[in-house]
Amino acid sequence: MFNLEQLHIAIIGLGYVGLPLAVEFGKKVPVIGFDIHQKRIDELNNGQDHTLEVSKAEIQQAVKLRYTSTLEDLKDCNFFIVTVPTPIDDFKQPDLTPLIKASTSIGQVLKKGDIVVYESTVYPGATEEVCIPVLEKVSGLNFNQDFFAGYSPERINPGDKLHRVTNILKITSGSTPEVADYVDEVYNLIIEAGTHKAPSIKVAEAAKVIENTQRDVNIALINELALIFNKLNIDTEDVLKAAGTKWNFLPFRPGLVGGHCIGVDPYYLTHKAQSIGLHPEIILAARRLNDRMGEYVATQLIKEMVKQRIQVVGARILVMGLSFKENCPDIRNTKIVDFIKALKEYDLDLDIYDPWVDENEVQHEYGLAPIKKLENGLYDAIVIAVAHNQFKTMSAQEFQALGKEKYVLYDLKYILDKTESDLRL
């Protein structure tokens, strides 16, 4: 029934997750990469990737891959992989709109014998409770009779050149035992690290959502410890280094938890828990604490400026870094923006410098205009917010030179020695 020789893959969504997947599969089997944005299709046809996840050489190696924004081009595909975003709304509830729209599109070209695999992070049950009914309604086909489904959660780490799609172990699952075997077989075409076949779609969904929830809770604990140690006038990094000498102490650091995964996924799990009458305590407490860190960091900076007799109103602040993590242009759900918003309440001037981000995207998403280059002697405070390689290679003297005669240097990322900055998280 399912034959690798007849495999024709469609990747729905060509962002940070979909493109690397499409490129790897495109080296082996016929693949069509579909994206609703024609600008993205044109960019990829020119061998360019603004996310910087895939190089031009890698794109050129995918000789069996072509790109389209035309749904009709997918009618000959028989294995659909959905990699669209799953954000939250303003009320921190799951926004499944992209997933529903993708399912609606696939339903229009779905045929008997086709398989639809979802990679987008969701709560346990979402694939079968939300996506499958859409596919059935639009296609007129019956689930597990005419078409089938699978779930294989993405584990892409944007900006990470060491952990790539092929060398990260992949969880797979299917709606029947036979489909699960076939989905696993398909992914093993490209996943060198191997696969783990989960016993059900719900198990695979749950596994993904707790991966990031666990990280979020652990970082929240360290953030809370940082708040305590700051009050006690103890350097947090010194404490973590000392505690880290024990073999089973987990190596987490305090910070602003943003991005499309860690700061979002826990809300998918808590939404599902609340829908069945459970109220998660630890997960939501961790989220609240991590969401407040931007405001806390801003307050700490203002306090230090006041302590050093630096005029706050009208002060000029430099924020170095805007992306949600180092060496990556991704600005989705970056918590640096929360920090910036909190600072703006003090009626001061802000410059943002980040050599990785796209200026137009920043302007469109947040209404901010990053500066293009650094100038010395301009700032009342300098904040190292993201540990880009460009910043890590700068000396303490280079950071200090950016300040006026009197200034505050706040190192959020432990780039400098503790003696070389005024504040650390």
Question: What residues fall within each predicted segment?
Answer:
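Structural/interface elements that position substrates and couple domains in central-metabolism enzymes
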Residues: 1-425
